[in-house]
Amino acid sequence: MNGAAAPPLLFQPLRILGLELPNRIVLPAMVTRLSGEDGFVNRAILDRYVRHARGEPGLMVLEAMGVHAAKSGPLLRASGDEYIPALRDLVAACRAVSPTRIAAQIIHFLKISRSGWRQTVGDLGRDEIARIVRDYGDAAVRIRDAGFDAVELHMAHAYTLSSFLSRRNLRRDEFGGRALEHRLRVPSMVLERVRERVGPDYPIGIRYDGEEAIKDGYSVADATVIAVRFARLGANYLSISAGGKFEDALHVKGEPLYPYTGYSGDRCMPSANYPDGLNVYLAEGIRAGLRARGLAVPVVTTGKIRTPELAESILRSGRADLIGMARQLLADPDWPKKVRGGHADRVVPCVYNNVCKALDERFHRVRCTLWRKRDLHAPEPPRDRSAPSWPDAATLRLSEIQGRVRVEWPDASAYGYMVLRREGTGPFVHIDSARGVALRFDDAGVTSGPRYEYEVVAYGLGGERSPPLGPAAIRLGGIHG
């Protein structure tokens, strides 16, 4: 959609209860690890979300905030009234630069240790369950009082409410076991409590798994029944994720268990080797089940959606109502503005190498590998929008290195480089990107036999593209003109 008009559905407004979103693009909650151990908003957190707001997604969901005062590392909290003033300042700062609507996600998580031990929902007593329900209600009121447009309840992945929903919840009472009605009980109590506390006119969203993606976990069939229950209890939108479970996580000795290291973690954050839109079918099935029962709750789909063409096709085909983009909007927060303005050809595309995920796994501050090394946030577009240019007589060099194709190019003083490849007479396809300091790329996705051609495009801070350098061609076993 290079230089084309903005997609008509993607930039239509959508109403959620009394809240109108200016477009259908959602920035889902992402861990940043930018706050202090005390859970307060600091300058880095404020700057990160103001930068996202400048890109103008329809809805921006702030990272999960603990509803309880347990030690959580550098994660935000909403567990006491003392957090409200700084949260209010963050909302005001974002509103000052953008029409984006702002929600906050709230979460309860169980205890884990470096030994690999973790608390489960089966360990919780009735008093503890009642406290969790109260904590969610209290935190939701704080979110409302801080000025957020909506609150989102975290019921996905490895955390407490998702663990109650899980088929792996083996409690032998009314809060678990084989009966879905029992597994729904605590999440339903939380939703009812939050609705009671925030009132009938305040939007409530729920983020939960469309499937657990683990052995003996629930599938989209259960997820549809869960959606119907949530809709009938007053949820105003449903944001569909997948996986992210402890059950198949890989434990590194001496480190706390991280729930995104197994296959279910791949399903939650699909990397480059998975197809685009991997999890859309989950939202599609859930939405169809809701509509069949006369329930019009909007459904958000997520999971490796990066192009306006794919986003628009999902909306047009009725597979979802809203498009969630996390890593793509981390790579380029200005995606919505660029696409709306007909400049999709200036988007800095996410390469889905999951460096951001690896940083979270190591408890480091989360950033994008495509940013300059000195940047803590995505750089602002420069006033000078001129594209990088290649040096005179620049050429693209290809060589075979142990079954891979090495692509090398000269320095164009660029923010980054896009590597494109085609096989035979097919179209050129973007296969990866590199920061401006990198001047080569090794392509491991090739085989002997076909003729491959490569081009490299340099891009500036605002995504402005140079003319392609190349093409240059190769077959494994030798270079061909």
List the predicted regions and their residue ranges:
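Flavin-dependent oxidoreductase catalytic cores
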Residues: 1-389
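Pro/Thr/Ser/Gly-rich low-complexity, intrinsically disordered linker/stalk tracts
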Residues: 387-414, 448, 461-481
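Recognizes extended acidic, P/S/T-rich segments that occur
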Residues: 418-449, 461-469
